[in-house]
């Protein structure tokens, strides 16, 4: 059975962000605006997205 995936795209720069936000962006595999990654849709990923919700765009794949 196939797991749900979400596409996370960084839309804003992390400049001026807190250490926690910078670490979360790095943990998600992002780094620059317009970078995108596909991750499993689980509680861990949703928690990370919540920390940087103002910097990313999320869509289901």
From Swiss-Prot:
Coiled-coil segments on the chain, per record: none
Name under which the protein is recorded: Large ribosomal subunit protein uL30
Species this protein is from: Chlorobium phaeovibrioides (strain DSM 265 / 1930) (Prosthecochloris vibrioformis (strain DSM 265))
Keywords: Ribonucleoprotein, Ribosomal protein
One of the GO BP terms on file: translation
Protein family membership: Belongs to the universal ribosomal protein uL30 family.
Gene Ontology, cellular component aspect: cytosolic large ribosomal subunit
A Pfam entry, by short name: Ribosomal_L30
HAMAP family associated with the record: Ribosomal_uL30_B
